């Protein structure tokens, strides 16, 4: 059956919402791995439509383990696939955002196309990444941030992980990932790896009714807010999108080069983030401030992006991000001890 859909998209046909749901279910339920890889490659080459993405998201969310949070929360996430091997900026920014008082429910996974995914660097920082919904809620309430490891909350995707990793190129799942937060966070910062995807995802985000506000952006070839150069994005709320162009230097940031944002493996990236949290200035600290400032603004705790950046900068300077990280590590250790005593 998947072969039928593969032939259809090879002929440049577009799938309906229901067909996109069906093809996703086929991929999750034992289709031939070679056909799945071919389908994903052809779909990426042909280009996805907003309707196809929305249908695939629907199929995946129906099979997910959902998390009901009794308060609004925010996620900072990127599509990945920019192949730049930068430090885990969105993960570090999530910790700084939590230090700024924003409840963070971060959804992520291990690396697919980079050296270190969000789950990898969090483990290297000493965080327990596998938490039940109940443990996650306690973590956010006590620490201000929690992490939902994709294989735990989207177990159906485990079957596709080896295929995606074996492809060694970005696929449609890079677009789907940021839209699959199990907590259905009302607020999101979503970075995308190129401008065509920015336009596509802005149309997809308009179809989601559960979100209050989303900031979707692309910056100088990366799925991160950095000071490399101009950032373009969309502020999406109440069924409308507003295009925004941002010059980081207008907020007091110095321009940087891509080499200043480079990371390594998960241990190296954990070390780099800790240095930034401990007061080391530079391009990485600026990127964390930029992203967290946007989070403060989008969440409504600042009236402008400039004010949000000022709050994030002051919070980082005062060492609050490092304190949140230490608190998160302590929570993780206590959780492991609690589990051990129950066995």
From Swiss-Prot:
GO terms for cellular component: cytosol. Pathway: Amino-acid biosynthesis; L-tryptophan biosynthesis; L-tryptophan from chorismate: step 2/5. It catalyses: N-(5-phospho-beta-D-ribosyl)anthranilate + diphosphate = 5-phospho-alpha-D-ribose 1-diphosphate + anthranilate. Anthranilate 1 binds at residues 78, 109. 5-phospho-alpha-D-ribose 1-diphosphate binds at residues 78, 81-82, 86, 88-91, 106-114, 118. HAMAP family: TrpD. Anthranilate 2 binds at residue 164. This is Anthranilate phosphoribosyltransferase. Its cofactor is Mg(2+). Mg(2+) 1 binds at residues 90, 224. One of its GO terms (molecular function) is magnesium ion binding. Homodimer. NCBIfam families: trpD. InterPro entries: Anthranilate_Pribosyl_Tfrase, Glycosyl_Trfase_fam3, Glycosyl_Trfase_fam3_N_dom, Glycosyl_Trfase_fam3_N_dom_sf, Nuc_phospho_transferase. Signal peptide: none annotated. The keyword Ribosomal protein does not apply. Pfam families: Glycos_trans_3N, Glycos_transf_3. It comes from the Bacteria. Keywords: Amino-acid biosynthesis, Aromatic amino acid biosynthesis, Glycosyltransferase, Magnesium, Metal-binding, Transferase, Tryptophan biosynthesis. Mg(2+) 2 binds at residues 223-224. Belongs to the anthranilate phosphoribosyltransferase family. PANTHER family: ANTHRANILATE PHOSPHORIBOSYLTRANSFERASE.
